[in-house]
């Protein structure tokens, strides 16, 4: 039997087989075409969590992990597992890049800022990694260490941030470490070039602009009462005592900044505006900083110190297609464009020979429940035109709707 000359990998991001009850949006939805495919053709399911995708046992998966493993065609051990091991076995305590940064702060009497997502979601970061960094900074004798916290509410309960902050504050009690600011990931971890969102985070971190509080946990509880959950938490600056006119600290020139998110996509923009990209029209200017990231966010970034370099993932599907002399196209809307390109190619930024990349802009709405179709129709039109014009041998296409709309928690929109 002659094998087909072309292949189409269509990824319904966030679509899965659930418990089949009232809370299962996909099961409750009307999906006649998908149902017909299941009825007519052989099919199977994939395990998307835990050790089967290179994560710690029981740890839920995510889009980055899924695309990386599919593109590699094998289990790729993830940064969460690697860093957990480094913390557990005190390898992080001996990390030369980290120690050099902390020693720089000590020798030059500079402040250390730990910035990143404070939760145990394990998708972008983990609170245990932050706790370890706090401990190491204390052990190394750093004069001042401050936490600039981003709240989650997306990869964990929408109102769990208050508990995480309380846990963190207990951990750093009686240590020369303090919580300086808090802001929701919606602003600090944008990845869609919504610079107006990023500016709120920048202004908090650099200019100290935000609501002034002395009790951050109470401030989060107040926010919940106003129906503003962790993801969308407005900027908060934390003061050590009532009546202070200035925040505890802001990021100053020549300070040491350690961004402890290990996933690469959602701290690129805040790193850009702090260190790489002067955006005068937005009122954001880069600062001369000793800047450290947990992993390498972007190979084009200059003067960034990296704690954990990624494993070199070779012989991915894209590379094999290139070696076979075939053509391929990767297509998604903005939200998932890095997943069908960078992640699917094993962390490779550049396109392979014979590879075309098509990005359809995501809609400019506050949350995707307001436009649950997102840019699916634009993707459809773009790929049909490309097939007609170029006849690619392989297509990798991502529809982001189920994942991105599902994250809003609005059941009717997801269904």
List PLM regions with ranges.
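Active-site His/acidic residue clusters
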Residues: 96-97, 392-415
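Active-site proximal loops enriched in glycine and acidic residues that flank catalytic Cys/His/Asp
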Residues: 261-262, 293-295, 332, 344-346, ...
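Active-site regions of oxyanion-processing enzymes, predominantly non-cytosolic
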Residues: 4-7, 383-403
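Active-site nucleophile/metal-coordination loop of metallo-enzymes that catalyze phosphate/sulfate
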Residues: 2-8, 15-186, 196, 200, ...
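Glycine-rich tight-turn/loop motif centered on a GG-T
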Residues: 84-92, 362-373, 406-415
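Metal-dependent catalytic core segments for phosphate chemistry
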Residues: 327-386, 415
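Structural motif
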Residues: 9-11, 113-115, 258-259, 394-398
